Amino acid sequence: MIYQAKTLQVKQLANGIAELSFCAPASVNKLDLHTLESLDKALDALAADSSVKGLLLSSDKEAFIVGADITEFLGLFAKPEAELDEWLQFANRIFNKLEDLPFPTLSALKGHTLGGGCECVLATDFRIGDATTSIGLPETKLGIMPGFGGTVRLPRLIGADSAMEIITQGKACRAEEALKVGLLDAIVDSDKLIDSAITTLTQAIEEKLDWQKRRQQKTSALTLSKLEAMMSFTMAKGMVAQVAGKHYPAPMTSVVTIEEAARLPRDAALDIERKHFIKLAKSTEAQALVGIFLNDQYIKGLAKQSAKAASQDTQHAAVLGAGIMGGGIAYQSALKGVPVLMKDIAPHSLELGMTEAAKLLNKQLERGKIDGFKMAGILASITPSLHYAGIDQADVIVEAVVENPKVKAAVLSEVEGLVDTETILTSNTSTIPINLLAKSLKRPQNFCGMHFFNPVHRMPLVEIIRGEHTSEDTINRVVAYAAKMGKSPIVVNDCPGFFVNRVLFPYFAGFSLLMRDGANFTEIDKVMERQFGWPMGPAYLLDVVGIDTAHHAQAVMAEGFPTRMAKSGREAIDALYEAKKFGQKNGSGFYQYTVDKKGKPKKAFSDDVLAILAPVCGAPQSFDPQTLIERTMIPMINEVVLCLEEGIIASAQEADMALVYGLGFPPFRGGVFRYLDTIGIANYVAMAEKYADLGALYQVPQLLKNMAQQGTSFYSAQQVSAL
């Protein structure tokens, strides 16, 4: 043994070849601080051993290295710039040391080789992998960019254009693509990976392969003419500006970094990379996006805990109520391997549900995600039925009938009598209290809410609503089932609107108050989309939700929270509802909708709506963008904080992920609690108090006032991952 540490070891093989194997005691290998320090010492030991003629890098895991340890990021990023610079220099010295070893080096890859793992193997002379290999640099998805030499070595290895595509998109290349672009030198069978690696290294040691020429290419300047460089970088900047936009600076910064370093040798190029990395690491976007990653891990950790604690796994499911929503739920369950009975009283609804499932599967087929055999198998695992035969096989039943409390209660009560005492019943509802529906059941402990978002196949969030009598095992089993479906389940306590709709309607109320005061709805949409970063402004979102749906939900919220959410008079939603302008669903709401060539609704403004809205709108008045943002967001932010204060949602992490996954809250802002930390809670309190005269929705919760006085925040700089 040449060197041994907790997460890696170096041993001597035959013919002067040494093997450095990453072997962390955890389920995956990560390039955390400890592993980097161990790698540094291992490379020193190798350089000092004159018997070593070649080095093989390998892994004892299914994945080579999944990347750096992201749980360390926020703590590192919070350090002074000088300390961050030192850390990056330390890491780069290690990879330079690997690249500069006086003998050939090769990485034998399998599974994921991502982020810092990819940057590590870029420092070796050769890379071979098996068919499972996936190699890439996902850092821009976290608001940062490669910082261990990725922007320097990758363009010199595979060319600037291919490198910029991989880096700016945060893309991982599968084995065949990696071979095509030059990231891999060969793909071999898994059982021959190490033997092939040794053969290749032996050829390099015997100088049958020119490893020094390869190394020279990676440590020199890029070989681009001035014209080639101008065309390449101009085109890349144009593409990135169009796709990433101004709220996500990391992709553009990556292009600028590669451009600035193009004519420099390795060490000077690494200085450029380090400078830009530090700037991104200190950005609020990076804090938010890294925070989202960690929060997502937290949610997954909670789901794993629930699955472990659950009394049984869900092997069979049932959906009551077909149509688009029922079909979407059935599709998602079947796709992830849980057969499902889809029951409805109307043949045309069953047909619609099966058509929806088939349509979604056809899209998967067209994209090459599944083959025809797999598609047929998934469709066969959805059983449409007009009767309850087979319902007793279901471990979890999702009721998804019409949004009417009497109908839902009747269906739930009926099906409860047909299943055994272990079966879990859930209701897919957006507005009906779970405690109300539970009154119709003999076993309310086996019942909870399971609120899917539309379209089911695309929206990651499922709200799991705990009723007054819901047992912990019911919650655990339903959370585990939602996770098995590939969803992000978040548990909330029962209240009108649950969490997502409860916090959404104050946002709509702020929008309505602005219109009452003379603001133009198209201007509000423009500001909330382009400046704040919502995928849709409030008027557009109301059209997509459906004006009729929103009108009904608004009444539910007003009844549930009369102090804050009761209307003071007719509003824009009322005017459109009365005019039967229901939004996208019937082609007319705030905007007019026509179907484009792809069958998607396209919106356009029409003056016709102004006459309908005139009675509920004040005289036209101009507001600056910041005022529009503040007046729409403060009611939502206050309500989110109240939900945490009241225990409707358990943590800031879960609330922020529910907002991002359920409402499309701008990821670069990280959710309401991350946003509050970013702008400063004391600053928020002072800002919100300027609008106190607008009513109860604008009253700052006591929790925020206390935190402002104490100078505390929701997230500490050293945020750790879950569980």
UniProtKB/Swiss-Prot annotation:
Database matches in Gene3D superfamilies: 1.10.1040.50, 2-enoyl-CoA Hydratase, Chain A, domain 1, NAD(P)-binding Rossmann-like Domain
Entry annotation: catalytic residues: H451 (for 3-hydroxyacyl-coa dehydrogenase activity)
Keywords attached to this entry: Fatty acid metabolism, Isomerase, Lipid degradation, Lipid metabolism, Lyase, Multifunctional enzyme, NAD, Oxidoreductase
Positions of the record's site feature: Important for catalytic activity: E119, E139
Gene Ontology terms: cellular component: fatty acid beta-oxidation multienzyme complex
UniProt: NAD(+) binding residues: M325, D344, V401, V402, E403, K408, S430, N454
Matches recorded under CDD domains: crotonase-like
Pathway: Lipid metabolism; fatty acid beta-oxidation
E.C. code: 4.2.1.17, 5.1.2.3, 5.3.3.8, 1.1.1.35
GO molecular function, one term: enoyl-CoA hydratase activity
Sequence segments annotated as region (Enoyl-CoA hydratase/isomerase): 1-189
UniProt region (3-hydroxyacyl-CoA dehydrogenase), positions on chain: 311-723
NCBIfam families: FadB (TIGR02437), PRK11730.1 (NF008727)
Function: Involved in the aerobic and anaerobic degradation of long-chain fatty acids via beta-oxidation cycle. Catalyzes the formation of 3-oxoacyl-CoA from enoyl-CoA via L-3-hydroxyacyl-CoA. It can also use D-3-hydroxyacyl-CoA and cis-3-enoyl-CoA as substrate.
Self-association and partners: Heterotetramer of two alpha chains (FadB) and two beta chains (FadA).
Protein name per Swiss-Prot or TrEMBL: Fatty acid oxidation complex subunit alpha
Organism lineage string: Bacteria, Pseudomonadati, Pseudomonadota, Gammaproteobacteria, Vibrionales
